[in-house]
Every structure is written in C-alpha cells, then in structure tokens.
C-alpha cells in the first residue's frame, strides 16, 4: 500500500498518516511541517494539507515547507492543498451591505487566524496566483484548481454566505526530473 501523509489533520482515516504540531489520539507523527526529516525522500504517493500553509511566513517558511513536501513525495505524487482564498475573503469582507460587523469580524478571523492556540495565527494571505508561483518555485507542475478534495471533513469545505472560501489545489511532483542542458 502506498503511504499518504495528512499534514495538520484532525480526522483519522484508513491509509493516511497524520502529522501535527500538537499530539492527539489521531496523530501518528508529532512534528513541524517544515521539517519532515523523519521521512525518506519520495516515500509518499500523496500529501494533503488543509489550511496549513497560511501559518508560515511567506519569505522563508512557506517556500521551505513546500520544498520539504516536494521532497517526501514520490515522483508522480500529488500534493492536495487547501488555503483560505484571500481574494474571496477580501471580497466578502467588503460587503458591508450584506454582512453586519459581527459577521465581518468572523471573516477577519478567517484571514488572520482564530488565535485559539499558539499555532492558530495566519502569517500570509494566499490566492491562486501566489500559490501558483510558490508551487512552481518548489518544483511542482500540473496545477489544478478543484472545487473540493472530498477526503476529510475539514476547513477545505468551509462555506460563508453560500460562497466556498477555500482555494483547493492539486499539484504534482514530476514523474521524472527535468534534464538540464
């Protein structure tokens, strides 16, 4: 059976190993998603992370995380990632005629994090253009936007006022390394 890694997961599911910064009964590996040194190169067929990347700083940590995730993916492996879509959240936040101040406050929390524990702070806002650039720099190809991943009951499927607020993407580690001339 091919190994699959769920980074930041909170729901146990057969066939998936969960890595999280905080221990719990569902967690297989406690650790930081920036350092997957416990795993060999190319050992996972899939890596899934929902609402994780926005917790890293955009200058150093986000590129390092994607490089690590790329490293542990097998050639031809898929990264399934979900982030709060800054474009959608910003648009909704500006709809003063639709949302009252309390509803807009909840939208603001989706942008900056809920601040419910030490890891619940968002350090970067992401949209499809930003994600495409980060994923390309990390060596991923074949970027696809998907409506939903339908793997876990998680924040990737959050809907506000009938609008999905997550940017759900699939990207692939090339099956063969590019030949440089």
List the predicted regions and their residue ranges.
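A short acidic, Gly/Pro-enriched loop at the edge of an enzyme's catalytic core
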Residues: 31-48
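S-adenosyl-L-methionine-dependent methyltransferase catalytic module, highlighting the catalytic core
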Residues: 59-68, 74, 78-179
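Conserved class I S-adenosyl-L-methionine
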Residues: 2-13
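Conserved Rossmann-like nucleotide-binding pocket used by diverse enzymes
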Residues: 17, 29, 48, 79-82
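A short SAM/SAH-binding and catalytic strip from SAM-dependent methyltransferases
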Residues: 45-60
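The conserved SAM/SAH-binding core of class I Rossmann-like methyltransferase domains
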Residues: 7, 19, 146
């Amino acid at each position: 059976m091919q190994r699959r890694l769920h980074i930041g997961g909170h729901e146990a599911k057969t066939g998936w190993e969960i890595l999280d910064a905080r221990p719990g009964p569902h967690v297989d590996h406690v650790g930081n998603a920036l350092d997957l040194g416990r795993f060999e190169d190319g050992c996972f067929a899939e890596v899934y992370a929902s609402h994780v990347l926005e917790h890293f700083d955009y200058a150093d940590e986000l590129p390092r995380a994607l490089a690590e995730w790329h490293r542990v993916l097998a050639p031809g492996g898929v990264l399934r990632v979900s982030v709060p879509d800054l474009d959608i959240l910003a648009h909704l936040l500006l709809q003063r005629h639709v949302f009252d101040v309390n509803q807009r406050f909840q939208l603001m929390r989706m942008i900056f994090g809920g601040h419910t524990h030490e890891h619940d702070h968002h350090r970067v806002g992401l949209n499809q253009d930003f994600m495409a650039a980060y994923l390309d720099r990390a060596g991923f190809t074949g970027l696809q936007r998907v409506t939903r991943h339908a793997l876990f009951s998680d924040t990737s499927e959050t809907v506000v006022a009938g609008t999905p607020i997550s940017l759900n993407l699939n990207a692939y580690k090339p099956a063969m390394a590019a030949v440089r001339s």
